[in-house]
Design a protein with these regions (language model features):
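C-terminal cap/linker of serine protease catalytic domains
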Residues: 55-119
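Canonical tetratricopeptide repeat
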Residues: 140, 174, 218, 252, ...
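Register position in tetratricopeptide repeats
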Residues: 147, 181-185, 225, 259-260, ...
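Terminal, low-structured helical/coil segments at or just beyond the last alpha-helical repeat
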Residues: 401, 405-435
């Protein structure tokens, strides 16, 4: 019998099973010869004992009715990845938050990548309602509000975390993290409730409740931001002698020592330790440490080791570092008299840099070409620079000197006179010399 519920009345219609099939080895699928199109999908079929044996599925034909085993319905479930499905994204309806908190967090993360901010806010609220003792929901809400400038709202969220969360240490730690991100990265100066001292207090409270080294590390980072470098270094140094001694700790210790005026020889020891804790082949995690050590070797005029680190960094970055890096490596290569690779790097810097920096890099490239007697190339590069900045006196001067070398004195003097007209006194010496 098909049981229909219509107009608040129960109606039953008798059906005869034409045949039944099995699917997934254990579920029944029934086909009935009769179909009057009156049943509502999902309506139950019951047997003589009143047991539900199937749920109605209307057929696309007019001659059959189908029913699926009700046990199969209990296996149907959604997962966090379903929020990315286009059919769900076309509606304003939110899905139910999964019972597993990790899956629920994944759902929120995936929702944050969509453009529906209302759904995202709703899912965060749903998560907090379902897992009020978990810190993650409050933190996610606070970070969203903070990024939108609602610092008071973010503060209120984290106070709720302190009140309701089971893990009080984690709540204090996340509170300082939310504050710290605003204090370090936001230009806002109106909201005065959050300070580095308050963030430090939260980190220390987290450590007091649960003495995890990560919380101690957080305190050291805040002290560094407060410019209390000696206190910060003391903690970093202590951490470097524990199981928490990772690359970041040694790198931060080196930064503290640099601010305290330590010698380069002391700093390179710490940076060596930072790089030594990176696994090979290097990944992006190692990038800042390898670059910092290369720059330190460069400052110590150990150009060979500096260049080795610069090359490793370029490999880590898949040749897509910024213009500043290629200019830095260019100068190192010039110091090693590796002029051809230096020219390659300065050309690449000019290619990837911001438009306003391009004339500067092109003038530098022309200067090296002049230095190594690539006179025709120096003129061409200087002309490229002058197309972007017609009054660039460096490019005009380099072009003039290159033209002198090419025995094109009238054109050379024209460039040098132009330099003088623009007020650059360097031209006087060369005008007198080549007049």
């Amino acid at each position: 019998w098909l049981v229909n519920f219509a107009d608040k009345k129960v109606k039953t219609d008798e059906y005869s099973v034409e045949r039944s099939e099995k699917f997934m080895d254990k579920y029944a699928y029934y086909i009935f010869a009769y179909n009057d199109k009156s049943g509502v999908a999902g309506s139950p079929f019951v047997n003589a004992n009143g047991q539900v044996i199937g749920l109605l599925q209307q057929s696309e034909t007019n001659i059959e009715t189908h029913a699926v085993d009700p046990r199969f319905a209990t296996t149907l479930a959604f997962n966090s990845l379903d929020v990315t499905r286009p059919d769900y994204n076309k509606t304003a309806i939110r899905m139910q938050v999964p019972d597993d908190s990790k899956q629920a967090l994944l759902m929120i993360m995936l929702t944050s990548e969509r453009q529906d901010s209302a759904k995202y806010v709703g899912y965060i609220a749903d998560y907090i309602a379902k897992f009020p003792q978990q810190v993650d929901g409050y933190t996610t809400s606070a970070l969203r509000k903070s990024s939108n400038g609602d610092f008071a709202g973010a503060d209120a969220d984290m106070k709720q975390a302190l009140k309701h969360a089971t893990n009080k240490a984690e709540a204090h730690a996340e509170y300082w993290r939310v504050m710290y991100q605003k204090l370090i990265y936001s230009n806002d100066s109106l909201y005065k409730e959050w300070t580095l001292d308050k963030a430090l207090g939260e980190a220390e409270e987290a450590y007091k409740i649960d003495p995890q080294l990560a919380y101690r590390h957080s305190a050291a980072q805040i002290l560094f931001s407060k410019r209390e470098y000696d206190k910060a270094y003391e903690i970093f140094d202590q951490l470097s002698k524990t199981s928490f001694a990772n690359s970041e700790v040694f790198y931060e210790a080196a930064q503290c020592k640099a601010q305290l005026g330590a010698k380069n020889e002391e700093l390179i020891v710490l940076l060596d330790s930072a790089v030594a804790r990176c696994t090979k082949p290097y990944t992006s995690v190692a990038a800042p440490y390898v670059l910092a050590r290369g720059q330190m070797y460069d400052a110590m005029k150990d150009y060979r080791r500096a260049l080795a680190d610069y090359n490793d960094y370029d490999t880590i970055m898949y040749g897509r570092a910024n213009a500043d890096f290629y200019f830095t490596r260019y100068k190192c290569e010039v110091n090693m008299r590796q002029y051809q690779v230096a020219l390659n790097d300065i050309a690449h810097a000019a290619y990837v840099c911001e438009p306003q920096m391009r004339p500067i890099y092109l003038a530098e490239m022309a200067s090296l070409q002049l230095r190594v007697n690539m006179l025709d190339n120096a003129v061409k590069t200087a002309d490229l620079c002058l197309q972007l900045d017609a009054d660039n006196t460096d490019a005009l001067l380099i072009k003039g000197l290159a033209l002198v070398g090419l025995k094109k004195k009238p054109e050379a003097m024209e460039c040098l006179q132009r330099v003088k007209t623009l007020g650059d006194q360097r031209a006087d010496e060369y005008i007198k010399k080549y007049k």
